[in-house]
């Protein structure tokens, strides 16, 4: 299946781009979707798996800890939290983002395996990630692996695994896009359902 799209990178190398600038670029370019790809970490080297987040409030301590780590590089301060609360409360993309996150999480879970077993599915979660605030489109943050887990780190170093991650993300994006009215996914000659 071929999904025709234009990918706009907020960065293509390891240079830092402020979290707020990433969403601002997506808005400026009038992107249809925003995907932030991250590597998780934990104090336990045994932690592993995948999880996908969308922007909203949470009382889940684990989700808050992940958001705190990711938000640590933000230019926002605690005193600006009230504005953050207002932005989230006014967001009309929360439900769309939750559905988008579910499609991404399902695809990652179905397509990524650790050896002979699937990666643990840590689920779809909500958290106040600065990088997702203000997005004018459905937006998610995918934690694709734990960099703090030596086995997962080793897999991430292989081009084959990174390609599988990219393909799983792509499949999740296509699955979500197909649920939207008016979106047609182009098919290649070899894909199922393509005209003869």
Features from the language model and the residues they span:
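Active-site-proximal helix/loop segments of hydrolytic enzymes
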Residues: 1-196
């Amino acid at each position: 299946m071929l999904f025709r799209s234009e990918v706009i990178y907020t960065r293509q190398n390891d240079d830092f781009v402020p979290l707020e600038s990433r969403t601002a670029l997506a808005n400026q370019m009038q992107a249809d979707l925003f995907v932030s790809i991250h590597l998780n970490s934990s104090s336990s080297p045994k932690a592993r798996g995948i999880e996908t987040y969308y922007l909203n409030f949470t009382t889940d301590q684990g989700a808050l800890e992940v958001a705190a780590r990711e938000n640590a590089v933000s230019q926002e301060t605690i005193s600006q939290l009230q504005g953050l609360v207002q932005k989230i409360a006014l967001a009309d993309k929360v439900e769309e983002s939750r559905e988008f996150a579910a499609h991404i999480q399902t695809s990652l879970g179905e397509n990524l395996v650790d050896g002979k077993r699937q990666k643990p599915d840590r689920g779809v979660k909500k958290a106040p990630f600065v990088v997702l605030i203000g997005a004018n489109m459905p937006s998610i943050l995918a934690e694709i692996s734990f960099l703090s887990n030596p086995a997962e780190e080793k897999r991430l170093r292989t081009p084959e695994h990174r390609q599988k991650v990219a393909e799983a993300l792509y499949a999740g994006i296509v699955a979500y896009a197909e649920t939207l009215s008016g979106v047609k996914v182009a098919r290649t000659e070899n894909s199922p359902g393509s005209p003869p």
